[in-house]
Design a protein with these regions (language model features):
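N-terminal Rossmann-like NAD(P)+-binding domain of SDR-like oxidoreductases, especially those catalyzing
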Residues: 1-169
Length: 169
């Protein structure tokens, strides 16, 4: 990316999202972060990451749920990203057994909302992060993209596999 781009990063307060946003901001790209800042991981850590990102003039942020299609669409239409990097997800294999609806809502409906708005605004690039959990019951310890992904072992893994299928379609 040699030209400066407008990039939406969902999950921008998470470990990977923050690191990516920081790197791209330092290169001069305009970054729009979108994150629910839920309490699955330490909220104070997420807020401190946002404080660092907010020091950049080329960073803007909205706290929101991906399931809130109206808020998401309004925010994205205002920013007009050329690239969307979708890293946000409700994470955690064990927690998905306790609150499966949250995983279905955030990971499937939220990702569908991202795909839909990306299509609507005709972004040049859409990157959607998945998880090694989609490989489920495979026996080998190092996975390949060509390995089977038809035996998920958790709701979390099933939602991530579902988002892959939705994106592919």
């Amino acid at each position: 990316m040699n030209k400066k781009k407008r990039i939406l990063i969902t999950g921008s307060s998470g470990f990977i999202g923050f690191s990516l946003a920081l790197n791209l901001l330092k290169k001069g790209h305009k970054i729009f972060g979108y994150d629910s800042i839920n309490n699955y991981y330490d909220v104070n850590l997420k807020l401190s990451r946002n404080k660092i990102l907010n020091k950049f003039k080329n960073f803007s942020f909205i706290k929101g749920e991906l399931e809130d299609q109206k808020k998401l669409n309004k925010s994205v239409l205002k920013f007009k990203p050329q690239i969307i990097i979708h890293l946000a997800a409700q994470a955690g294999v064990r927690y998905s057994l306790d609150v499966p609806r949250k995983y279905l809502s955030t990971n499937i409906i939220g990702t569908f909302n991202i795909i839909e708005i990306a299509h609507k605004i005709k972004v040049k690039h859409l990157l959607i992060a998945s998880s090694s959990s989609v490989y489920g019951a495979n026996k080998q310890s190092a996975f390949k993209e060509t390995d089977k992904t038809d035996s998920q072992l958790s709701i979390y893994a099933a939602t991530k596999k579902s988002t892959e299928s939705i994106a592919h379609s």
